[in-house]
Amino acid sequence: MGTILDKIVEQKKKEVAELYEIYTPVKTKRKTQSLVEALQQFTVIAEVKRASPSKGDINLHVDVRKQVGTYEKCGAGAVSVLTDGQFFKGSFHDLQTAREESNIPLLCKDFIIDKIQIDRAYEAGADIILLIVAALTKEKLKELYSYVLEKGLEAIVEVHDEQELETAIVLNPHVIGINNRNLKTFEVDLSQTEKLGKRLNEEKLLWISESGIHSKEDIIRVKRAGAKGVLVGEALMTSSSISSFFEDCKVNI
C-alpha cells in the first residue's frame, strides 16, 4: 500500500515528468525577500491551504488575494502557499496570486523532488522553498539545497524526528522546520517541537514549528521550546477572526 508520503512522492514524479515536457525555465533574476530577516523576531508564516489529505476540503474556494491581504494586514512575517494540486488542491497560480498581492517573504509549500519545481516556484514568485527530508535521499536533499542557494532563494529544511534532524543539521540550512505532523501517518504530536527544539537550540540554528498549532496555549508552548516562528494553515483558513489569532501570537513568555 505505502504511506501517504509514498503516494504523494509517486504523484510528484509524474508531475515532474510532465513539467519537463511543457515548461522551460526562464533565465531571469529578481529581487527576493528574506525569511531569515523576518525571523529575527517571532514570526507567523501564514498559509493558504485549500485542503489536505488528513482534513479533506478546508476552505476550497478561498479568495487567495483577499486572504493574503488579511494575513499581511494582521502582521504575518511571511506567507506560505500550497502548490500541490492532487492532495492539497493548491496551484502555482495561487502562488503567483499571492506574490501579486504581497511583498513579504513567500514560501512555496510542496513536495519538491526536482530542480525544475524550484525553477517553477521561482518564476511564480517564491522566495523560500520547502525541502522535506522525509521525501528525499541525502544526496538529493544536498543537491536541491545547493540549487536553492544558486537561485538566490532561502530554504526551510523540514524534519520530524531525530534522524531527519541530524541529516538537516549537516547542511547548516537557513531555517529548519520541525513538522509536528508525521508525513507517513499524518498524525500530529506537538511534543516533537520540544524534543527536537532542544538539539536545535544547542546548535544555535534558526527554527520554526509547523502543524498542529491552533491556540494561544500552543503558541506559548512552542515559544518556550525556542521556536522563532510558526507555520499555521488550517487554524487560519477556518478562523472567524484571523486578527485574534495574530494577537494571541504576541503573547510574552
Swiss-Prot record:
Its EC number is 4.1.1.48. One of its GO terms (biological process) is L-tryptophan biosynthetic process. It catalyses: 1-(2-carboxyphenylamino)-1-deoxy-D-ribulose 5-phosphate + H(+) = (1S,2R)-1-C-(indol-3-yl)glycerol 3-phosphate + CO2 + H2O. It holds the Pfam family IGPS. GO terms for molecular function: indole-3-glycerol-phosphate synthase activity; phosphoribosylanthranilate isomerase activity. Pathway: Amino-acid biosynthesis; L-tryptophan biosynthesis; L-tryptophan from chorismate: step 4/5. The keyword Plastid does not apply. PROSITE patterns: IGPS (PS00614). It is an enzyme of class 4 (lyase). InterPro entries: Aldolase_TIM, Indole-3-glycerol_P_synth, Indole-3-glycerol_P_synth_dom, Indole-3-GlycerolPSynthase_CS, RibuloseP-bd_barrel. The keyword Lyase applies. Keywords: Amino-acid biosynthesis, Aromatic amino acid biosynthesis, Decarboxylase, Lyase, Tryptophan biosynthesis. PANTHER family: INDOLE-3-GLYCEROL-PHOSPHATE SYNTHASE (PTHR22854:SF2), TRYPTOPHAN BIOSYNTHESIS PROTEIN (PTHR22854). Belongs to the TrpC family. This is Indole-3-glycerol phosphate synthase. The gene is trpC.
